[in-house]
Amino acid sequence: MTKLTQRLAASLEAAARLLRRYGDDEVKVLVLGGVRSGKSRHAERLMARHPEVVYVAPGPVPSGDDPEWAARIALHQARRPANWRTVETGDLATTVRKASRPLLIDCLGTWVTRVLGDVGAWEAKQGWELRLDERMEEFLDAWRDAHVPIVAVTNEVGMGVVPATASGRLFRDVLGALNDRVAAQADSVQLVVAGRVLHLGERALL
C-alpha cells in the first residue's frame, strides 16, 4: 500500500468515525462579522447542542492594566456554559489536530495579531514573511483535515475604509487572505450583521 493510499484510507476512516459520532452535522463553520455584530453570540449558539465544548482563545495574552479588555473577556465568559473548557493558546494547528471534542475558536483576528507579533512582522524582522506563511499553512492543513465539529469566529475586514497605518493594512491583508482560504475549506460560511445571520453561497468565486 502506497503512502498516498494509506493517507486516503486513514482520512476515510476518520470521516467514518466522525459521522458515527456526530451524524451529518456541518463539521467546519466559519462565522464572520464586524465589531459588536453578534458573531460570537451566534457561534456560541451553534455549539450549544454539544454537551462538551473546548473554547479556544488564541489571541495575545492581555496585560493586567487594560480594564476595558478584561471587561470584554468577562462578558464572553459569563455567556458560556459552565461545562465548557477554555484553552488559551496561539498554537491553533496542534489544538485542532489533537482535538477530541468540538472546538469554538474565537477569534482568528486576534490569532493573526498574535502570530504577526510572534514572527516579528511588526518590526519587519528578517524572514518574517516565511515564518508567517509557515504558521498559516500549518493551521490551514489542520483545519482542512479536522474531524471534530469546529466553529471559527473571525472579523470581516474587507468592508471598511483602508487603514491609515502600515500595520493596520498588513493586518487587514493577512486576515482577509486567511478568511478566504478558511472559507474555501468550510462546510458553511455565515456572515453576521447587526445580529442577523446571512448564509453565504457554497461556491467560491474564481
Ranges and model annotations:
Residues 29-98:
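Conserved P-loop
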Residues 60-61, 110, 158-160:
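A short, flexible beta-alpha/helix-coil linker loop
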